Regions:
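Helix-to-beta-strand junctions that scaffold the AdoMet/dcAdoMet cofactor pocket
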Residues: 154-155
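Short, Lys/Arg- and Gly-enriched loop/turn segments at beta-strand edges
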Residues: 25-35
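A short acidic, Gly/Pro-enriched loop at the edge of an enzyme's catalytic core
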Residues: 129-137
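Rossmann-fold dehydrogenase core element
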Residues: 159-161, 172-181
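Helix N-cap at the beta1-alpha1 junction of Rossmann-like dinucleotide-binding domains, i.e.
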Residues: 111-114, 144, 167-168
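Glycine-rich beta-strand-centered segment in the early N-terminal region that forms part
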Residues: 1-24, 51-53
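Mid-domain Rossmann-like dinucleotide-binding core that forms the NAD(H)/NADP(H) cofactor-binding site
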Residues: 57-128
């Protein structure tokens, strides 16, 4: 975003492009970290100044942070073998997994257009995946009902990391998931 107002004792200027990691200082939206808020009020020291030419790509810092956080949550188990969702977050997660773990992952994506643009990893419609041995799965799809479809592809004792931004409460058929355990 851009600074619209600042105090005299700060090292930022009105109009400066900035990134605000993990802010809870939203003023008009009560949501996850205020990411959908129109404005945020934060101490100047929390701001990360961005080059003017960066445009809106600075938002990728937040998504990369989310992708890295999801990978850290799974680090004792290993990188995911399946990533659900090929939006910006899913693409970052796949690329970070490949770069950091030298592991090629499979990504599920239900939208045909979003299945395009992979760089060395496989992107499938979930209905095309015949595997039933996924040990580590990371969902970044935002689809609150994807677990029922995914659980049938899990190996016994698989781990699911939920790292998407869901518009509705996550729901799943507990008996089917329990039977995979």
């Amino acid at each position: 975003g851009s600074v619209v107002e600042c105090g005299a004792q700060t090292n930022v200027e009105v109009g400066q492009r900035v990134f605000i990691p993990g802010s809870r200082g939203f003023t008009d939206v009560h949501g996850l970290f205020g990411g959908a808020a129109h404005s945020l009020v934060v101490p100047a020291e929390r701001l990360v100044k961005l080059p003017t030419e960066m445009e809106s790509t600075g938002v990728l810092l937040a998504l990369a942070g989310t992708a890295c956080h999801a990978l850290r949550r799974m680090e004792d188990l290993g990188p995911p073998d399946l990533i659900i969702g090929h939006g910006a977050l899913g693409r970052l997660l796949a690329r970070i997994t490949e770069a950091g773990h030298h592991k090629t992952v499979t990504v599920w994506e239900t939208g045909a257009v979003r299945r395009e643009g992979s760089l060395g990893y496989t992107v499938l419609d979930p209905s095309e995946d015949t595997r039933r041995d996924c040990q580590r799965v990371c969902d970044v799809s935002g689809a609150h009902d994807i677990i029922d479809q995914a659980v049938h592809h899990f190996a016994r004792h698989a781990t699911l990391c939920l790292a998407g931004f869901y518009a509705a409460p996550i729901q799943f058929n507990f008996p089917a998931a329990f039977m995979r355990e």
